[in-house]
Curated annotation (Swiss-Prot):
Organism: Arabidopsis thaliana
Example GO BP: transcription by RNA polymerase II
UniProt KW Transcription regulation keyword: yes
Highest classification ranks of the organism: Eukaryota, Viridiplantae, Streptophyta, Embryophyta, Tracheophyta
Assembly mode: Component of the TFIID complex. TFIID is composed of TATA binding protein (TBP) and a number of TBP-associated factors (TAFs) whose MWs range from 14-217 kDa. Interacts with TAF5, TAF10, TAF12, TAF12B, TAF15 and TAF15B.
UniProt protein name: Transcription initiation factor TFIID subunit 4
Record domain RST: where: 79-149
Amino acid sequence: MDLSIVKLLEEDEEVDSKHSEDDLQMFQDSLIRDIEGSNLKSINNTTGNESEKPQPRYMKLQKMSSKETPWVEKTVDPVNHNLRLARVTDLLRTVVDHQPGKKTHCLNLHYKLKRKELTMEEFMRQLRDLVGDQIIRSVISQLPQLKPGNMGIKVPGRSNHDKVSKSAEFTAQESDPREVHVNQLSSTTSGTLNSSTTVQGLNKHPEQHMQLPSSSFHMDTKSGSLNPYPGTNVTSPGSSSRAKLPDFQHRENNQNVGIASVGGPTKSTINMTTVPKFERPTFVNGPSRVQDGPISDFPKNSSFPLYSAPWQGSVTKDHTVGPSSSVIHVEHKLIDQSFEQAHKPRYLVQQGVTNVPLKQKNAIPISSNDDLEKQSSKMGLFTSTTSASSVFPSMTTQLDSSTMVNMPAPSETIPKIANVTVTPKMPSVGQKKPLEALGSSLPPSRKKQKICGTSSDESIEKFNDVTAVSGINLREEEKQLLDSGPKKNDRVSKAYRRLVHGEEERTLLQKIPLQRKLTEIMGKSGLKHIDHDVERCLSLCVEERMRGLLFNIIRISKQRTDAEKCRNRTFITSDIRKEINEMNQKVKEEWEKKHSGEEKNKENDTEKEDQRSNEVKANKKDEDKERAKAANVAVRAAVGGDDRFSKWKLMAEARQRSSPGPGRNSKKLSGGTQFGKNQGLPKVVRSISVKDVIAVVEKEPQMSRSTLLYRVYNRICSDV
């Protein structure tokens, strides 16, 4: 068969999957009558009445409740246009299998019938003209006959219950757009589940009860919604015609929807109040193929919520519960919408449905109020509803045995899901807070505080004392320093005195020539005696005078820029003596190289050994220095001194180590880096000449006309 026909027929299969045997027999009889041409008028009248004026189910239920009691039995007409469409698809399949060449004509007829452009009689007449009477009769005889299903709406007022076919539900679904249909999901591979959906009532309280199989009650805690019917198709009263929700694919990444496999039709009862006037009864269809999708999306298409009235009821605690069901008594109270959004967790439901964030496997009955409170505190049961008729003053949900919600609960469903936080009750305004609750005590006295402070300071000092850890006793060190102080001072003072005395005895001028000069001056001037201090004083004066002269000469030599030029410009072309000296020096160097090779090897060996020993000694010295530095740092930290000086020292040493090559060149480079002005200029070698001496002597008033200045002039002239 072609894929396009298969897709078309699969779309129509969503309308119905199984029907009763009576419906099939009636449809076959009507088809045979249409083919034979008998009783066409009667069939037209019946089908026209059913297709044009379908009576909605909720109107029938209201009529039943208004006449006698709300529990009167009422059957529903089984014939439906959707049933005919479903059977027509089966008929067209078999016809196309017999005659594949007439596929396009069959498709056109099917579209016209689906759009209600053709009636059933016209469709059958055109199909009979297209294919033939014999083929249509053989196809109708080959149509599969189905067993009667277990689905139906039952009323507990009588012993026998009528079986209502699926066609009646589809008529109600098509005729009344305000009804809410919840179709249970059933997998095609594992088969269908036959379960009975009954509308029951209690004798004391006229309430509606819906029995659902345990497999259809599922909790979705991630998406934040209670999904009692996984994969349902819901129509809301906001649409003018039959409003369908869009198909949702079963996505595991967005939400985790688990469908429990059920061996038998286990039941769970949900007690509800009577539906208000603006609401319509909810139908639960049997196991059929439905669309997948979260139930939490249906309020988008509706103008009011599905359950606007709070669930109430008065059921006694002696009510028996089956082994695969659990009884949870819940009293719902109104919670503000904003308060719910601010304080409720994500898995709570805001549409008035009890939310139990648990996977349901086995059942645990909970009958009493106290047991339920304990159980709910362990497993994190939260309930919330919205009320359309009354407003409760309290803002918290409470648990009561008046309302009973039966749902399958597992025996393993008491894990540690939610952490229940209990806020401590605050005392009243006039009540005094005990000291134990506040965790405080009376403040101690000042003396005790001082004692504790001193003891803590001592302990901290002992703990922070680095010298104690290193094994140094400061008190003993102080005693040793005090004891050895005066002795050391005496020794130092004696040595210092000796050095000063030796330096004082040393003079710039020698004694013998100075004494000769002094005797000559004494003879000329007529002096007889001179003290020894005069000689020392004269030598010191000469020294100071020479220091001043040299300082001035050096300063002037730095200021001088002109270079000395010889008066007689002579160019030396050849110097024979210099060439002979260079040749002799080369010969000596070659001879020294030959004879000094062996001596150098010996010296190298000795130098290597010396270098090794020096390196070992240097390493030891470095280690000793580092230990001493660490000890000094520890002592300074213990005493409380500042350690910046030692840090600067270490930084300077590190710079010296990183500098390339020790020596004068490195010092010059470091000096050049310090002064940016002279960094790029090469250093000029300075020298002192006679001109500098003359310039200094001429500026002095005492020496400007002295004989020394004339002598210097004469030397310059003689040298030139």
